[in-house]
Amino acid sequence: MKWVNKGTVERVKQEFKDEVKYYETKHTKGFEVSHDFLKPLLKFLKERERFLHFVDMTCIDFPEHPNRFQGVYILYNPEENERVIVKSWAKDGKLPTVEDLWPGAKWAEREAYDMFGVVFEGHENLRRMFMWEGYEHYPLRKDFPLQGIPEVELPSLTEVLHGRTDPPSHDFELVHTKLPTLEDLERTEKARLKKKAELVLNWGPLHPGTHGTIWFLFDLEGEKVVQSDVILGQLHRGMEKLAENLHYFQFIPYTDRMDYISAICNELAYVETVERLLGVEVPEKARYIRTMFAELQRINSHLLWLGTGALDLGALTVFLYAFREREKIMDIIEGNAGYRLTSCFLRIGGVHYDLAEGTLDVVKHFIKDFPNRLKEYHTLLTRNRIWLRRTKDVGVITREDVHNYGLSGPVARGSGVPYDLRKLQPYAAYDEVEFDIPVGEVGDVYDRYLVRMEEMAQSVRIIEQCVQKLEKLPKDAPYLNKEHPAVIPPKEDVFHDLESMVKSFRVVVHGEDAPPGEVYFAGENPRGELGFFIYSKGGGKPYRTRIRSGALYNLSIFPKLIQGRTIADAIALLGSLDPVVGETDR
């Protein structure tokens, strides 16, 4: 994938003269524009230069700068396969909304307001995204402490139970950060959705059909949904704040806990981003191991989607069959990483371990058997009359919707948009294997089902080629770039080699010593584009880490799709979007 070309740069300069400044770093290209010309520039890029696809929007806090907050917009041109970054300083803590250009910016702007306090003028309903209404602080500001602001005093257990006020026997602080009260949650609900019809129905945040702590609000006229909104944040853990206070390698385990169904895919997107910033080359063996395990994880994720989605619509058998194959994949992952879910298998510069003895034989057995299992799933569902009635012509997403909402993954490809970063921006070993990109025609729930089913078949093709390549490589081929100064050596080297021990100590204590600069890179997660924007001022920790969640943007179109449909369709529709709350909330 390229960055903005010279022709576009020249046309922008001719149109906006001195109001726009072109900038270029080692890994990115874009424009810096004054506040008053931000929206005209973005409109020009969309309508004249065909940067149709909204990728992401966030802010960076520079307390020492007079304007303090800088807005960062990332756009994509699907015709030229180019990205561009646009930056603009807020004026008096305000930026113009671009929700009218890209509806997908609605949630991104809410998040920037929630985390930084930046106000977006003209926004339809600017509310907090993850925190509750009435919360007074902005967590991603640099003056907000990592541990939060203790401001609520809680009595000790001895005082509550026995009425004694003597010091407790533990050393826990009695003053804690705020938690939302029931009144706060009620205020949040009413601020999100102004009642227009007969009844506001709460679906979630604890309901088996939501597959996670997502809180849906439906304004109903009978069984028809007049309007809806989604309240997130029940699983918000401040991932981006944590990333800014950790060394680069220390954040790898946290990526596992976002989309915890696809931990290795998360790790892969993150370490590929950091490796570009640090200039780390990855050995060939590690690239193929990464690719093989990422595709195993993709099948694993799609099997969970298939089993639970079918179960929600009444097909119990498919659920049992899908979990049978899923267990085999998780056994392979556990045998190599040591953990079934939060594997923490990848490292900056390669992978943590070489392949366990017999791994390739087990993988070959699995990919030989799995196509037959896939046929079983098709037999049970693909031409099933009930399945067709529940999925055909439900939740139709157009190609225009894909670009306007920043949709990606199977959701985008189900609408006929071949947006797959494994092809458009090859990483790991994807440029050395052959596979096809399945796309839909209508863009409904059924098309998204067919795309994911075919993706599993394509993953088998990729895994098969990875196995063949790994069998040809020498057993002692390197799986980690030990020579790079930013790479932590394997534990066995640290225990037996003085130089490795000193290097390990230096990196663990002081960090990787990244150069100043910025980088945006994304991986093709089972839920779509999982991107990381890292802004570095040098040193062992990033100044700003932005996590672009594909699951979040895919979920953002839900209120539009459910409008005018019945509550029963919400189950099928949400299942086809396949969000994981650990990633949406971060």
From Swiss-Prot:
Compartments where located: Cell inner membrane
Annotated region described as NADH dehydrogenase I subunit D, given as residue ranges: 197-586
The reaction(s) this protein catalyses: a quinone + NADH + 5 H(+)(in) = a quinol + NAD(+) + 4 H(+)(out)
Domain of life: Bacteria
Gene Ontology terms for molecular function: NAD binding; NADH dehydrogenase (ubiquinone) activity; NADH:ubiquinone reductase (non-electrogenic) activity; quinone binding
UniProt KW Lyase keyword: no
Keyword Repeat in record: no
Keywords per UniProt: Cell inner membrane, Cell membrane, Membrane, Multifunctional enzyme, NAD, Quinone, Translocase, Transport, Ubiquinone
Family statement: In the N-terminal section; belongs to the complex I 30 kDa subunit family. In the C-terminal section; belongs to the complex I 49 kDa subunit family.
HAMAP family: NDH1_NuoCD_2 (MF_01397), NDH1_NuoD (MF_01358)
Subunit organization: NDH-1 is composed of 13 different subunits. Subunits NuoB, CD, E, F, and G constitute the peripheral sector of the complex.
The name this protein goes by in its record: NADH-quinone oxidoreductase subunit C/D 2
Organism: Aquifex aeolicus (strain VF5)
